[in-house]
Structure formats: structure tokens, C-alpha cells
């Protein structure tokens, strides 16, 4: 793992907001991805209730809707979501209305809540808290049983970010991280990430690893 040092915090936040605005309509996560995560979670989670669930770096929020519907939602609605998904600048829906039912609230986080964190103020909605994912609300400590992000490479300081994610994770939580082995840049300061780097940062036990097409990876870590 290599880190491009960005010492100015204000500059870092402004850069990440601009990046989010440019890619706001892009959602890397698909219905199939979250369906696979759902199977993994149900196989390994330690508690009667799976949630609450937290998605980090959510941009337009579609991944929040996918996690909520697939894990906690109506099977009929899920069938419609799957049918109307198209691959267009990532994954999107021809009829996003079907994905918007029963969104959670950041002001009332329950066992079946699915919440997002996004640095871009344009993403504000009832289930999305606007902040950096390495500076989250103090009262979220030990809150979330499932944490998902494909944005770890956007961290300014990977050790600080990992500690913050561990702080808000419930004991025994599953943290799912998508990452690629690309060089560090101004917008993705953490580059050349390897699975051993994440294991060292987060500890716990690796319960899942996938190598997609040789350049993109998903890893699931169950923390102690």
C-alpha cells in the first residue's frame, strides 16, 4: 500500500467533494453484488438482527437502496429492481422509484436501518449523513453490524480511517471493502492496496475474498 500525502485537510475535503460531484450518477455496486453480499452476511453474522447497516462513500445513494431492499425488503419489489437495472455508467435503474420505498432515517437508527455517509452535500437525504468517513458522529460508536465501502482508496490517512470504521463497528461486525491495485492519486490518495494491508489495518478474520477480473477485489473481514 502506498499513500500520497495530502497534508491540508481543507484541500483534501474540497477535492473529494469535487470528485463526488463529477461522478455523482455513478454507482459501482449492482443488484448482483449486493445479493452476493446478502448471502455472505446471512452465513456469517453472529446476531439475530443483521443491522443496522452502514454504507460509506455513497454518492447518489443507490447502494443504500440496494442493501435495504435486498436484505430487508419485499421480494416482489426486489424482482422489479433486478428486472429494471441496467449497466449504464456503472449500474442504475430504469425506474428508480421502486428502489426508494421505506428509506431509513439518520435520526432514528434501528436494527433494520440502512444508512449512508457521503462527503458531498448534494447527497443529502433522510438516510444519508453528510460528513467525511473518517469523522463520523460520536454517538455511532459500536453501532453498525455491517459496514460496506468501495471508497477506502479515497482516505487521507488509512490508519485513521480504519480506526474510525472500527470505532463505529459493533463487536463481531462484518466489514466489506471493495478495492483495486491502482496507483495513488490526488483523488484516491491510497494506492496499490493489498489484502494484507487491510488485514493489518482492521485485524479480525477474513471470511471472504474475491478477485474480479484481476484488478478489482472484495474482501469481508469479521472483526473481534
What are these regions (language model features)?
Residues 1-48:
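Class I SAM-dependent methyltransferase Rossmann-like catalytic core
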Residues 182, 186-213:
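Conserved Class I S-adenosyl-L-methionine
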Residues 172-181:
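Conserved beta-strand signature within the Rossmann-like core of class I S-adenosyl-L-methionine
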Residues 154-165:
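A short, conserved alpha-helix within the catalytic core of class I
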Residues 131-147:
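A short acidic, Gly/Pro-enriched loop at the edge of an enzyme's catalytic core
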Residues 9, 213-220:
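Short hydrophobic/aromatic beta-strand or adjacent loop that forms the aromatic wall/cage
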Residues 52-135:
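Class I SAM-dependent methyltransferase SAM/SAH-binding core
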Amino acid at each position: 500500500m502506498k499513500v500520497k500525502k495530502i497534508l491540508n485537510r481543507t484541500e483534501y475535503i474540497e477535492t473529494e467533494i469535487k470528485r463526488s460531484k463529477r461522478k455523482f450518477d455513478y454507482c459501482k455496486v449492482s443488484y448482483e453484488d449486493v445479493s452476493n453480499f446478502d448471502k455472505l452476511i446471512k452465513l456469517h453474522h453472529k446476531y439475530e438482527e443483521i443491522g443496522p447497516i452502514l454504507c460509506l462513500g455513497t454518492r447518489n445513494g443507490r447502494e443504500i437502496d440496494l442493501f435495504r431492499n435486498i436484505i430487508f425488503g419485499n421480494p416482489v419489489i426486489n424482482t422489479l429492481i433486478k428486472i429494471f437495472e441496467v449497466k449504464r455508467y456503472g449500474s442504475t435503474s430504469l425506474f428508480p422509484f421502486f428502489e426508494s420505498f421505506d428509506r431509513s432515517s439518520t435520526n432514528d437508527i434501528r436494527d433494520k436501518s440502512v444508512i449512508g455517509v457521503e462527503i458531498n452535500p448534494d447527497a443529502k437525504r433522510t438516510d444519508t449523513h453528510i460528513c467525511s468517513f473518517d469523522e463520523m458522529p460520536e454517538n455511532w460508536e459500536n453501532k453498525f453490524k455491517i459496514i460496506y465501502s468501495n471508497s477506502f482508496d479515497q482516505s487521507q490517512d488509512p490508519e485513521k480511517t480504519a480506526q474510525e470504521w472500527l470505532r463505529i463497528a459493533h463487536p463481531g461486525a462484518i466489514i466489506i471493502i471493495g478495492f483495486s491495485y491502482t496507483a495513488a492519486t490526488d483523488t484516491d490518495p491510497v494506492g496499490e492496496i493489498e489484502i494484507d494491508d487491510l488485514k493489518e489495518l482492521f485485524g479480525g478474520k477474513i471470511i471472504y475474498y474475491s478477485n474480479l477480473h484481476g484488478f478489482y477485489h472484495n474482501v469481508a473481514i469479521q472483526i473481534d
